[in-house]
From Swiss-Prot:
PTM sites of type Phosphoserine: 162, 170
Protein name: Capsid protein
Entry's family note: Belongs to the orthohepadnavirus core antigen family.
Region annotation (3 X 8 AA repeats of S-P-R-R-R-[PR]-S-Q) ranges: 155-177
Short sequence motif Bipartite nuclear localization signal: positions: 158-175
One Gene Ontology biological process: symbiont entry into host cell
Annotated region described as RNA binding, given as residue ranges: 177-183
Subunit record text: Homodimerizes, then multimerizes. Interacts with cytosol exposed regions of viral L glycoprotein present in the reticulum-to-Golgi compartment. Interacts with human FLNB. Phosphorylated form interacts with host importin alpha; this interaction depends on the exposure of the NLS, which itself depends upon genome maturation and/or phosphorylation of the capsid protein. Interacts with host NUP153.
A Pfam entry, by short name: Hepatitis_core
Amino acid sequence: MDIDPYKEFGASVELLSFLPSDFFPSVRDLLDTASALYRDALESPEHCTPNHTALRQAILCWGELMTLASWVGNNLEDPAARDLVVNYVNTNMGLKIRQLLWFHISCLTFGRDTVLEYLVSFGVWIRTPPAYRPPNAPILSTLPETTVVRQRGRAPRRRTPSPRRRRSQSPRRRRSQSPASQC
């Protein structure tokens, strides 16, 4: 079976493969981040989002993998074989878990569309020959200049006043928002 854990989120294993392995923080750092930012949602019996569910599953898989690693460490007598198993788990499984954790934490933090746009931008950047690309790689925490961040249900503000209307000299009154519109 060819199962891609990112497919339902609009990404793919191939898209994440453009990011170098040292790009991803350690599992410990990612688990600490997930706990600090999303502990309540992850521990809640309520369903939040598919990203929360996938993050829960990745955390549970890592826990099971660590249980297996402890068992191997305690029960495998041959040190060379034990080292092979530990190195394989850290190199292959560790990277996959780090990618999964990073992807879902980033989607929850920055939004799925921003993360997907970042992955595509980075993929284009890394495949462009060095002589023809900007010196710095795209950065996820920097929103693209074209992104407009505003509350739902409000019309975009004009940047300049209409030439037909004079600006009032008195300060503008702010409309109070209803509690329902703050979600």
